[in-house]
Amino acid sequence: MAIFRIDEIRNMSSEELEEELRKLEVELIRERGAVRAGGAPEKPGRIREIRRTIARMKTVQRERVRK
């Protein structure tokens, strides 16, 4: 799953944004599950990056609603 920059997120349609957000949330659950199962994550900073990207996406969604 790609980590998106804010300009890439703003250029997405609302439907595309929803779809990518769902994919990232599933990936975050999978990564957290792997850590809780006792395994070391392949990329330790991945969870943090996923969380930040989700926050960026939700921010853009909220900006669109408020307009």
From Swiss-Prot:
Transmembrane segments: none annotated. InterPro entries: Ribosomal_protein_uL29 (IPR050063), Ribosomal_uL29 (IPR001854), Ribosomal_uL29_CS (IPR018254), Ribosomal_uL29_sf (IPR036049). GO terms for biological process: translation. SUPFAM superfamilies: Ribosomal protein L29 (L29p) (SSF46561). One of its GO terms (cellular component) is cytosolic large ribosomal subunit. Gene3D superfamilies: 1.10.287.310. GO terms for molecular function: structural constituent of ribosome. Keywords: Ribonucleoprotein, Ribosomal protein. Pfam families: Ribosomal_L29. Signal peptide: none annotated. Belongs to the universal ribosomal protein uL29 family. This is Large ribosomal subunit protein uL29.
